[in-house]
Amino acid sequence: MAQISLTFPDGNARSYDAGVTPAQVAADISTSLAKKAISATVDGKHWDLQWPIATDAQIAIHTMADEAQANELVRHDLAHIMARAVQEIWPATKVTIGPVIENGWYYDFDRAEPFTPEDLGLIEKKMKEIINKREPVTTEVWERTRAIEFYKANNEPYKVELIEAIPGTEPIRMYWHGHWQDLCRGPHLQHTGQVPGDAFKLMSIAGAYWRGDSNRPMLQRIYGVAFTGKEKLKAHLHMLEEAAKRDHRKLGREMDLFHMQEEAPGQIFWHPNGWTIYTTLQDYMRRQQRRGGYVEVNTPQVVDRKLWEASGHWEKYQENMFIVEVDEEHAREKAVNALKPMNCPCHVQIFNQGLKSYRDLPLRMAEFGSCNRYEPSGALHGIMRVRGFTQDDGHIFCAEDQIESETAEFIDFLSMIYKDLGFEKFSVKFSDRPDTRAGSDAVWDKAEAALLSATRAAGIEPELNPGEGAFYGPKLEFVLTDAIGRDWQCGTHQVDFVLPERLDATYIGADGAKHRPVMLHRATLGSFERFIGILIEEHAGKLPFWLAPRQVVVASITSEADDYVREVVAELCAAGVRAEADTRNEKINYKVREHSVGKVPVILAVGHREVEERTVSVRRLGEKQTSVQSLADVTIELGRAATPPDLL
C-alpha cells in the first residue's frame, strides 16, 4: 500500500499507509491520546477521527483541552443528541437542521403540538440518558439515491430536500449514535460519553420559517448552550442573568429613553431623555472630528438607482435596500430611487466636484449619515439592530503612500474616543486578501503591510482573519469587550481600491497626471443607535455623568423648601448641569426610589435645615450614604462633572 507522510505540530513526521485515520494515528502515538482524542486538524481543516487521510498532510490531534475544537464538537453532538431525544419522546416529530452557533446550538423541528418550557426539562433528561449510554458515534458516506430513499421511507421530507440541494460533487455523509442517525458533514466526537453531561442547558423555544422563507412551513426552534465544563456553563448563565438586568430595552423603559412600535418596525421613537444622550454624544463626536481634521458634509436620503448601479450596490445589496418608485410628471417611465443604505457613493460625488490635487490629500470627509437597510423582522433587536440608523461615517481620500499614516491617526483617534466613553481596552481583527479580489498583488501587499504596521505601532497585535477581507481591500475591525465579557464589533477601517475607480474619482498628482485616490472607509462608533445600546448595557444604565440625560434631581422634603429647590436647580443649570425639580407632594423616600430606578446619578434632597444653611443633602446613585454639601461647592463639583471630557 502507498505510504504517506504526516507532519505534527512539533515538526516531526511519521509514515503511514494511505487511508489512515486520525484515530489510528492517535493510537500509534499513545493509548492515552487515543482515549482522549476528539478530532484532528488536517491541512487546516477540522477532521473527524474516522475520516481517512489519503495524501501527505500536516496533522494535529485535538483533545478536550483544545477549547475551540472541543466547544464546536460538544455543541454539534448535542444538537444531534437533542434531536434524537425529541424523536424518542415524540416519534412523529420531523427533524430539519441543527447548526452550531455562538455558545451553543439550535435545532428546528416540525411538530404538530407546540413545545412548552416544561418540555425542555423532559428533553434534557432524555439527553443525559443518551450521553450516559456512551454509544459510539459512527459515520458512512452513502450514495445520493440511497440517502433520499432512506429519508422518504422514514417520512423526513426536510432531509430529502437538503440532500437534493447538495451539489453532486459533494459526498452524502451520515452519522449514527445508537439507532439514531442524521445527515451531517461532521466532524463529531468518538462516543456520546465524551459530551459533558453537566455542562449544557436548553434555553428557549422560538418559531422559525423553513429556509427563512415566510412562504414555507413554520418550525419550532429549540436553543441550547454548552461548554466543556460545568463551571464554564455556570459562568455563562451568570453572565446571561447579568445581561438580562442590563438589557437596554428594559432600561430604556425605566429611564424613559425610547420606544418602538409595530407601525414603524426597526425605527426608533426617541423620547426627550434618549434624544439628550444621542445629541450629547453627537456633539462630542462632531467636536472631536473637527479637531481630527475632518470636514463635515451631508448627503441626500433618496438617490436614483443609477448611482447605486454605478457603485455596484444595486447588484450586490439591492435586497437590503428600500426601493422608492415615483411616477414623475412628464416622465416616460417611473423614477426608481432607493433610500441610501450607506454614505460612501455620495461622498465620492462630493470629492468629484471640482479638480483635486495631490496637495488636497488626504481629504477627510465625515457625515452623521442617516441610513436605511432592510433587516428581516426576526433579526431586529431593540435599538441594537434596526432598519433606520445614523452612522458616524467617514471617508478618507488619500494616496497609496498615505494609507499607513492615516491608519495610525485613525487608531489614535478611535482610542481616545473609546477611552472617553469608558472603554479602556479593545482588540483588533485584521482581514487580508480573499481569493477573489480587485487590484494587483503589489497594491494589496502595500495596503496590508500599512494596516499591520500602523496597528502594531499602536501597541496592538491584531487577530488575523486570513482571506476575510472584502474583494475591494483589507480591513481592520475594532472590538470592545464590555463589563460582563461580551464582545462588540464597533469601529472599522477599510481600504477600498474599487469604488474610486467605479465612480471615476481622480486627483492630479505631482507629475501632472491623473491618479486614482485610495478610499478609506472608517467608523468609530458604528451606528449611534447601536452604540448607545452598548453604552446603556455596559454601564447598566448608570451612564457617565456627562452623558446622563437627567443628571440631577433636586427633591423637596417639605413644600416649604420648594422655592429653594427652584433656586438650586437654576444655579445648577447655569453651571451647565441638566437639573430638574421634584416638588411633588410625595414622601422623600418615594422620590428617591423612583429617580434611582430612572438611573438619575445625583439626587439632592432639600428640607428646612438645607434651606437655612444653604446646603443640599447629596445622594449618589448606588450609594446608601448621603452627605451634606454647600450649594456653592456642589455646583462647582457637578458643573465640572457635567462637562464632556474633551472640554475639560
Curated annotation (Swiss-Prot):
One of its GO terms (biological process) is threonyl-tRNA aminoacylation. Binds 1 zinc ion per subunit. One of its GO terms (cellular component) is cytoplasm. Residues 1-63 form the TGS domain. Its cofactor is Zn(2+). Its EC number is 6.1.1.3. It is an enzyme of class 6 (ligase). Its main location: cytoplasm. It is found in: Cytoplasm. Coiled coil: none annotated. Residues 247-544 are annotated as: Catalytic. The keyword Nucleotide-binding applies. It catalyses: tRNA(Thr) + L-threonine + ATP = L-threonyl-tRNA(Thr) + AMP + diphosphate + H(+). Keywords: Aminoacyl-tRNA synthetase, ATP-binding, Cytoplasm, Ligase, Metal-binding, Nucleotide-binding, Protein biosynthesis, RNA-binding, tRNA-binding, Zinc. Gene3D superfamilies: 3.10.20.30, 3.30.54.20, Anticodon-binding domain, Bira Bifunctional Protein, Domain 2, Threonyl-trna Synthetase, Chain A, domain 2. Homodimer. PANTHER family: THREONINE--TRNA LIGASE, CHLOROPLASTIC_MITOCHONDRIAL 2, THREONINE-TRNA LIGASE. Belongs to the class-II aminoacyl-tRNA synthetase family. Catalyzes the attachment of threonine to tRNA(Thr) in a two-step reaction: L-threonine is first activated by ATP to form Thr-AMP and then transferred to the acceptor end of tRNA(Thr). Also edits incorrectly charged L-seryl-tRNA(Thr). This is Threonine--tRNA ligase. The gene is thrS.
